[in-house]
A protein has these predicted regions:
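ABC-type nucleotide-binding domain
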Residues: 1-258
Length: 258
């Protein structure tokens, strides 16, 4: 998958992406990070063809996605978004929606890979458990695992994780991240992330700022460069440490939660 010198604007007088150029090799994981408004989510919308590019091209296996029907393109890509949409039906139905013709064994195997099978099996009604409107009967982490299982079952050529863990607490995020690492192994994967701790194992990290790629490389390389990525990393590590200290103080009774 490749973005070739892509430019894009939602409005004619305000360009969002400026010459974005990168390749995600088959079976590798590329992460895109950057501040809010940098254009990260725009990249996922373009890949899914909610919008077409103004200049340049997006290709999959060398073919311009503008020459592919939206139906076949979206069959090629499996997305796990930040806000998972679940139907007011059973857990089984919500997973099987990824590929309705799948067998029960395939649905349960997808759930195992997403690390939700044991939880579902422990419920009185198991896979027949109703999730409620928009999945309100499940926690945020459980909903994301259902979404991951659904995407695994779909067996897409490309995986897209669009801020898939950003709305979760730190502990749940770590657990979900372990699932994502397992699922994305040897698959062509694009990860759009806010928390840098979730993408340190990526083969390549792209740092997007004001619609331009300003840095690229592996996690260790970007830290050595001591540029935009390194500053973002330090800020997030300091914030995480402060949060941990505060939680410890509350647990020790030195502070009371407000």
């Amino acid at each position: 998958m490749a973005f070739r010198n892509v430019t894009f604007s939602y409005e004619t007088n305000r360009r969002i992406l400026h010459g974005v150029d990168f390749i995600v090799p088959a079976g590798k994981t590329t992460a895109i990070v950057g501040p809010s408004g940098a254009g990260k989510s725009t990249i996922s919308r373009i890949l899914f063809r909610f919008y077409d590019v103004d200049g340049g091209a997006v290709t999959i296996d060398g073919q311009d996605i503008r020459d592919i029907t939206q139906k076949s393109l979206r069959a090629t890509i499996g997305i796990v978004p930040q806000d998972t949409v679940l139907f007011n039906d059973s857990i089984y139905y919500n997973i099987a929606y990824g590929r309705p013709a799948a067998s029960r064994e395939e649905v349960e195997e997808a759930a195992r890979l997403a690390r939700i099978h044991d939880f579902v099996s422990s419920l009185p009604e198991g896979y027949d458990t109703k999730v409620g409107e928009r999945g309100l009967k499940l926690s945020g982490g459980e909903k994301q695992r259902v979404a991951i299982a659904r995407t695994i079952l779909k067996k897409p050529d490309i995986l897209l994780f669009d801020e898939a863990t950003s709305a979760l607490d730190s502990q749940t995020e770590r657990e979900i991240q372990a699932s994502l690492r397992e699922v994305s192994a040897n698959r062509t994967t694009l990860v759009i992330a806010h928390r840098l701790s979730t993408i340190i194992d990526s083969d390549e990290i792209l740092v997007l700022e004001a619609g331009r790629i300003v840095e690229r490389g592996a996690h260790s390389e970007l830290l050595e460069t001591d540029g935009v990525y390194a500053k973002m990393w330090r800020r997030q590590q300091e914030a995480a440490e402060a949060e941990k200290t505060l939680a410890g103080a509350i647990a020790d009774g030195a502070l009371r939660p407000t």
